[in-house]
């Protein structure tokens, strides 16, 4: 388990050592009315807000990476969720990566988070606030067993389930990505109130955090939403398929060349970087 924790920590800090992308040269939000542009995995943002790093309800991790920017709707969602968590006595919400000042591609660790509508939130709820040293080098708590088939009972809690449920019930949220084993546990514990489970989607990794995605703001005319998740709670055959062994001959997909930037994002780079 210690090796897994080290690997998770390395995943969270590895991007700092990779070559910078042009988007990292933009150090402040681009002025203008907030506009999320294009798709979550190939886009940018004008008029991003800065998430305040000081709050009684949440703490921001790895502030040295300057990934605490997003659409005003995302900032308000984080403030709303963390306030609800505090009201219920769940603990302090730990905020990971949002986006860069103008969005755009990261140098590693994320394919999305480009339009200011994504945020990673640790699935830990400390009752005592973390020190600055802990926040700069966060220790991810792996909730999933080594074989990936279930959560670790001693690490799972109803508070974590409540945090995910609170996020899923927010009207601005369209998807929450978690490890399949975490989704499975949520399905087992949900009882008869299951509508919110539709938004919780199984995905690779995500063993220690949830990745929350908001819908496109109505006034962001170039923003591209994903189709809604399939109807139902997602606890049936689709979820079970994640636990089946890979079919013979299955290979890892080749790394794709990033697609061309949308014209509005290319124009933004041309004006502010190139």
Swiss-Prot record:
Q: What are the GO MF terms of this UniProt record?
A: metal ion binding; metalloendopeptidase activity; serine-type endopeptidase activity
E.C. number, please?
Answer: 3.4.24.-
Q: Which superkingdom, per the lineage?
A: Bacteria
Subcellular compartments: Periplasm
Residues the record lists as binding Zn(2+) 1:
110, 113, 120, 211
Keyword NAD listed? The answer is no
Concerning InterPro entries, the annotation shows: Hedgehog_sig/DD-Pept_Zn-bd_sf, Peptidase_M74
Q: How does the cofactor bind to this protein, according to its record?
A: Binds 2 Zn(2+) ions per subunit. Zn(2+) ion 1 is bound in the active site. Zn(2+) ion 2 is bound at the dimer interface by residues from both subunits.
Q: GO biological process annotations for this chain's record? A: peptidoglycan metabolic process; proteolysis
The signal peptide stretch is 1-19
Q: Which Pfam families match?
A: Peptidase_M74
Which residue ranges are recorded for the region named Disordered? Answer: 225-274
Q: What does this protein do?
A: Murein endopeptidase that cleaves the D-alanyl-meso-2,6-diamino-pimelyl amide bond that connects peptidoglycan strands. Likely plays a role in the removal of murein from the sacculus.
Q: How does it assemble?
A: Dimer.
Q: What protein family is recorded?
A: Belongs to the peptidase M74 family.
Q: What is this protein called?
A: Penicillin-insensitive murein endopeptidase
Say which species the protein is native to: Salmonella choleraesuis (strain SC-B67)
């Amino acid at each position: 388990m210690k090796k897994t924790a080290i690997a998770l920590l390395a995943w969270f800090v590895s991007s700092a050592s990779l070559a910078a992308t042009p988007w990292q040269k933009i150090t402040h939000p681009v002025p203008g009315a907030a506009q999320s542009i294009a798709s979550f995995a190939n886009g940018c943002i004008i008029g991003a807000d800065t998430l305040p790093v000081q709050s009684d309800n949440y703490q921001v991790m790895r502030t040295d990476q300057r990934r605490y920017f997003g659409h005003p709707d995302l900032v308000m969602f984080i403030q709303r969720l963390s306030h609800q968590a505090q009201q219920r006595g769940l603990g302090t919400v730990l905020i990971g990566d949002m986006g860069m000042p103008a969005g755009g591609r990261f140098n590693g660790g994320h394919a999305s988070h480009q339009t200011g509508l994504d945020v990673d939130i640790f699935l830990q709820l400390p009752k005592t606030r973390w020190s600055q040293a802990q926040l700069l080098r966060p220790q991810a708590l792996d909730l999933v067993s080594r074989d990936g088939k279930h959560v670790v009972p001693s690490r799972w809690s109803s508070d974590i389930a409540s945090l995910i449920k609170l996020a899923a019930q927010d009207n601005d949220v369209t998807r929450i990505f978690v490890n399949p084993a975490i989704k499975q546990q949520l399905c087992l514990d949900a009882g008869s109130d299951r509508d919110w489970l539709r938004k919780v989607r199984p995905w690779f990794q995500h063993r220690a955090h949830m990745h929350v995605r908001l819908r496109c703001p109505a006034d962001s005319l170039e923003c591209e939403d994903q189709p809604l998740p399939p109807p139902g709670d997602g606890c049936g055959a689709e979820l079970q398929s994640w636990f089946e062994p890979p079919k013979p001959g299955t290979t890892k997909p080749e790394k794709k060349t990033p697609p061309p930037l949308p014209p509005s994002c290319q124009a933004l780079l041309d004006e502010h970087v190139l």
